[in-house]
Amino acid sequence: MRKSHVLVLAGILLLLSPVLSQQKSLKVVLLYDMEGVSGATSVRHTDFGANPEYEEARKSLTADVNAAIAGLKAGGATEIIVVDGHGSGNSQGPDVLEAELLPPAKMISRDRSFDIYMDSYDQSVDAIVTVAMHAGAGNPAGFLSHTYTIEDIQYRVNGTPFNETMIMAMGAARFGIPIIMVSGDDQLEKEIRRYLPWIKYASGKRAAGRTKAEPFPREEVSRRIEKAAREALLALDTARLPENFPGPFRFALTFQDESQARTVAGLQGAELLADSVSVQIRSVDFEEGYRASLRLISAAGLVGRVQAMQRVLTAQPNAAALRDAVSKYITDRWLDPQPAPPAPGGAGAPQRYWGAR
């Protein structure tokens, strides 16, 4: 090949290099929750029972998610996997209006439940964004603030208060995957700025306490989310992982009362702390410690629900009769066990799981 031809070919490749670089495959996981939806201003907006507020919030959620999809696509994403992080997906379908998602986004569903913070991604993913998230437990100013459970159990790792976005960030760090963009209320933004300040953030509303929020205008929110998602993906090369990864790790859970803490003390190696309402477990592996903490939360949650039922029961005018009925049911089930009833719907289509727990 002549030298002149080599120079011409080199010039063509130089001209094409921006185009070729833009065609690089970029896979992004988009996980959404619902408390941080721009249009969700009361707890009924997040309750997937049959109520008009929930259906209204689904439309707002879809607008938030689509704004992020548009931004990611503009930033070069070639594959966008959407994960339901609110929990409704395990009962009736995803919270988002799946048929209205913009391309190239696709929902994932599986034939068994999976943990959204540990199991919704693998090494093939380049980045993660989380949409419509909320502040963590212990933040009294955050709209519907909690971490993993509405039992209001405060969750700390190595002394740092954790919200669910931070759990996701630590889980993804196992594979070197960064969270690059988050949306939610202004209280979550403060938490993210404090602990993960390099992440792009789009605020959709102002929290007015735990039970109320003041949304920003719809078009403004969509612009914010789209811009943050686009800029975050374009700056992927500068993305960072949480600084305290790898461990070892101390997972501390602070419960609402002492009975919950004492119930789980000793389980999963948990030790009761001096305040008598907190327990702590240690792990050299984040995922292992996280999954152990969930088992403690589940056990404590049973205690909390039983206590709540007892208090409600006691307040009823026919409390004694109700207690007798419960006692009789338990005794009858013990002495005369009956076969389990058939599953609703018979042997129809298998259960599908879109995401959260």
Protein language model regions, located:
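Divalent-metal (Mg2+/Mn2+/Ca2+)-assisted nucleotide/phosphate chemistry catalytic cores
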Residues: 105, 117-174, 178-182, 201
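Glycine-rich nucleotide/cofactor/substrate-binding loop typically near the N-terminus or early
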Residues: 24-26, 40-41, 65-123
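Short catalytic helix/loop segments, enriched in acidic residues and glycine
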Residues: 46-67
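Glycine-rich, Lys/Arg-enriched anion-binding loops that position phosphate/diphosphate groups
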Residues: 161-265
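C-terminal accessory domains and tails appended to enzymatic cores
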Residues: 80, 221, 228-357
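Bacterial N-terminal signal peptides
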Residues: 8-18
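Bacterial N-terminal signal peptides that target proteins for export
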Residues: 1-8
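Boundary at the C-terminal end of the N-terminal hydrophobic targeting segment
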Residues: 19-23
